[in-house]
A protein has these predicted regions:
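Repetitive beta-strand solenoid architecture
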Residues: 50, 66, 72, 135, ...
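Autoprocessing Asn-cyclization modules and mimics
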Residues: 21-134, 145, 149-151, 181-196, ...
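Acidic glycine-/aspartate-rich tracts in secreted/extracellular proteins
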Residues: 81-84, 145-147, 155-158, 220-221, ...
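Short, solvent-exposed secondary-structure boundary/capping segments
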Residues: 54-55, 143-156, 223-228, 432-435
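Proline- and Ser/Thr-rich low-complexity, intrinsically disordered segments
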Residues: 20-21, 538-794
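Bacterial Sec-dependent N-terminal signal peptides
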Residues: 1-23, 622, 637
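Extended Gly/Ser/Thr-rich low-complexity repeat segments
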Residues: 64-82, 158-178, 210-213
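Glycine-centric low-complexity/flexibility signal
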Residues: 87-120, 159-161, 176-178, 185-461, ...
Length: 794
């Protein structure tokens, strides 16, 4: 047997791999911005560990890059987006509703704090159980059935609940992928059931050119939507504390979407509005005109969460007027939204919030809280939480920004270039969302509402075989909070200048890779600001930045290595395979087909039966998303036949051997002649003995009998008996004699004389060289003969 070494065999191997396996979608270049490559569907029935089929809404999945329906060998990503449980006690709201407003109130509380909830607002919405949220796995398709079933080559490793919005993402399997400069690929927008996830597998090289992007920035969970309802200002006492959550829109703005759900789920627990943060979603700004909180993603769960984000240290004096020690504090998660509205110009450097002198809504601490930090878990990945909306009553408020999505890459080759892979949160929407500018001589007034909180950073998850270089940038930053952009005409009615709440910054996201030194950014987003001249010395006006996310190198990767083999006659061979990286527990499994269930062996080696024809086996491991093809090529030795035509070599030209015939084996052939004869079938060489070796594409070979290229001998000169007579002063001329030559049709030529005799006479003193030429034009030359001169007496 012969090892599979030749480059042509590599081409054959790739063709086997590409059939229903990695690289099946070929090479691809992204040339335009915002190209969508994935296609999406949703799980339609709960799925459990060990299942090898899933039920989906549609198994066509022929959108995005794909023009054909899902088929065997395709790759899917299964991920549960939501389904988290959070700390919400609905007792007060349900009693309020059931009693027609006679008891309790239109609000919900943290568990255990029905009566003292104002002291424990940060507990509202904290994550109590993740359930299956964020669980994910790659799976290879074995087949599809009907229009709604996908059969898998490996059983599921996770449970999935459809109540948690499980989506199925079809993943392109590229051989090589190039992202051109200024081009980008993005997912579909998360729409509440699918989207927000960009997933790609590349078997070979990923080239990410300058300004090229693989991005899910702003494609994640949705921000809270503004509604033009509020209680007005002031709605009560200066020290009133707004609700954590309520089902009544006049109490506050809508919360951002989170891993616990969105308005459908929030409505079920009477908690769609107000400042409490639902899991990693930002809280909505409370009335009147407070800013929305920023969404979040993974973050520190050892630091105490207050929902207040990170106050800018530039304004520690102002923060400490709100609460001693607040300046320099750090709450993980998203940033808080800014204070509620004020209409009186006071000194913000000496007068804190919740003071009657501010008028309006007293500039109360009613901004939406930043999203709760998610506990890092290597078995889960999350979308960034949406920002909470700003409270509005003038249709000038800003909605919350979308969270960053998930950028998921499986890379078996190298990555190069200087582009960006990102999943940043989107900025919160400004108060005055359309950027209108009031005409000076008018009553126009724009921007007089609360701004939206930013989206939290999403997740960049890369399983890479080779290290990611430091020329690549990975980014999962939180977005920046929305700004209050006031623009008021000179004839506007009072209040002509008011300060409302900017949005909180989004918390940083999550980056996980296998290895490398890329630039990694998981920064929290900045708070928004206000341009109101009432708080010119404190533009954040109560809004804070989001905290940083987390990066690590915990992403697992593995690959299966195996070499093909060759038999030049029917026989058996032992094939070997190994793994690199961090494969799942369990043995390698040898199959007879790429997607079938027939197992022929387990373990790292397999001895085949006697094979008469070329046969391919497939090695996989479960859980896993591919099988590696291993081919045993069965061939025969090539034959060398024919009577060669041999032309002898001469002193002026090489000889040749031609007209041999090669047959059998597997083309193309390679040739090698002995004695450095060259690597072509037809030989051109000096006289000598030569043997031809022929190797076919499978490495099988044959050698010929020896072939002789004869040589044609040229003339020769024997000068050993040469006699030189001198020229003498008495007139006797010199001569050269005794030279013997061999050859046919010889002619002679001497230097320095016209004499053409082999033994010339009549020579003057001097130096002479003889050249003899035969009938074939071959020559031989003598050494130089010197005829002396003998002078007379002096």
């Amino acid at each position: 047997m012969k090892p599979y070494l030749r480059s042509v065999l590599f081409i054959i191997l790739v063709s086997f791999q590409a059939h229903g396996q990695r690289a099946k979608d070929g090479n691809y270049t992204v040339t335009s911005a915002n190209s969508v490559l994935n296609s999406y569907t949703t799980l339609s029935s709960n799925a459990t560990i060990g299942q090898s089929l899933i039920s989906v809404s549609s198994n066509a999945l022929n959108g995005g890059f794909f023009t054909t329906n899902l088929a065997a060998g395709d790759l899917i990503l299964i991920i549960q987006m939501q389904g988290t449980s959070m700390n919400v006690d609905t007792y007060a709201a349900s009693e309020y509703i059931n009693s027609n407003g006679q008891f309790w109130g239109p609000y919900t509380t943290p568990f255990g704090h029905q009566n003292d909830w104002p002291l424990f607002i940060p507990l509202w919405g904290e994550i109590t159980a993740y359930n299956q949220t964020g669980k994910f796995e790659l799976a290879q398709v074995r087949s599809v059935s009907g229009t709604a079933t996908i059969n898998l080559t490996c059983p599921l490793t996770n449970n999935y609940a459809i109540s948690g919005r499980v989506q199925i993402v079809r993943v392109p399997r590229f051989a090589n992928l190039t992202i051109n400069s200024n081009a980008s690929t993005v997912p579909s927008l998360w729409n509440g059931t699918s989207g927000g996830v960009l997933a790609i597998e590349v078997d070979g090289n990923l080239i990410l050119n300058a300004n090229g992007k693989i991005s899910s920035s702003g494609y994640g969970f949705r921000g809270g939507v503004t509604e033009n309802q509020t209680l007005g200002a002031p709605s009560g006492s200066v020290n009133d504390v707004g609700f954590c959550a309520s089902h009544v829109a006049t109490q506050g703005a809508e919360k951002g979407e989170s891993i616990a759900g969105f308005y459908t789920e929030y409505d079920l627990v009477y908690s769609r509005y107000c400042k409490g943060a639902p899991a990693n979603g930002g809280g909505g700004g409370n009335n009147h005109n407070a800013g929305g909180g920023g969404g979040s993603n993974v973050g520190s769960t050892t630091l105490t969460y207050t929902g207040k984000g990170i106050p800018s240290i530039t304004y520690n004096t102002n923060w400490n007027l709100e609460l001693a020690g607040m300046g320099g504090s750090n709450s993980p998660g998203g940033g808080r939204g800014g204070y509620s509205g004020s209409t009186s110009d006071q000194n913000e450097n000496t007068l804190g919030p919740n003071q009657m002198a501010w008028a309006g809504d007293y500039r109360r601490k009613e901004g939406g809280l930043g999203g709760h930090p998610i506990q890092q878990d290597n078995t889960r990945i999350f979308v960034g939480g949406g920002g909470g909306a700003g409270d509005q009553n003038n249709s000038q408020g800003g909605g919350g920004g979308r969270g960053g999505g998930i950028t998921f890459l499986k890379l078996y080759g190298s990555i190069s270039g200087s582009g960006t892979i990102e999943a940043n949160g989107a900025n919160g929407i400004n108060a005055n969302p359309n950027g209108q500018i009031a005409v000076q001589a008018s009553t126009q007034k724009y921007g007089n509402d609360g701004a939206g909180g930013a989206g939290g950073g999403g997740s960049v998850y890369i399983s890479n075989t080779n290290p990611i270089p430091n020329t690549i940038t990975l980014s999962a930053n939180g977005g920046n909070g929305g700004n209050q952009q006031l623009s008021v005409g000179l004839l506007a009615t009072s209040p002509t200048n008011e300060a409302d709440g900017p949005g909180g910054g989004g918390g940083g996201g999550y980056i996980s890779i296998s290895s490398g030194t890329p630039i990694q950014q998981v920064n929290g987003g900045n708070s928004g600001t206000t341009n109101s001249t009432q708080v010119i010395n404190f533009p954040p006006n109560g809004a804070t930045a989001g905290s940083a996310g987390i990066t690590n190198t915990n992403t697992n990767f593995f690959d299966i290595l195996a070499a093909n083999d060759t038999l030049c006659a029917a026989g058996s061979v032992t094939l070997n395979a190994s793994t690199i990286g961090n494969p799942p527990a369990g043995n390698l499994i040898w199959y007879t087909s790429a997607f079938g269930t027939t197992v022929v062996a387990t373990g790292n080696s397999y001895t085949t039966p006697v094979l008469n024809t070329t046969t391919t086996y497939y090695i996989g491991i479960c859980p896993g998303s591919f099988r590696r093809p291993v081919t045993v090529f069965v061939g025969g030795n090539p034959s060398i036949t024919g009577t060669p035509t041999i032309v002898g070599a001469t002193c002026t030209s090489s000889g040749t051997i031609t007209n041999l015939t090669i047959s059998g084996g597997t083309q193309p052939y390679s040739y090698s002649w002995s004695n450095n004869g060259g690597n072509s079938l037809n030989l051109v060489a000096p006289a000598g003995t030569y043997i031809l070796s022929v190797q076919d594409a499978l490495g099988c070979s044959s050698t010929s009998i020896p072939y002789i290229i004869p040589g044609i001998t040229g003339p020769s000169l024997n000068v050993s008996s040469a006699l030189i007579n001198p020229q003498i002063c008495n007139g006797t001329m010199g001569s050269i004699s005794g030279i013997v030559s061999t050859g046919t049709n010889l002619s002679y030529s001497w230097t320095n004389t016209a004499n053409n005799s082999i033994n010339p006479s009549g020579l003057s003193a001097g130096s002479y060289v003889l050249t003899v030429t035969d009938g074939n034009g071959c020559t031989a030359s003598s050494p130089s003969f010197v005829v002396p001169y003998v002078a007379g007496p002096m």
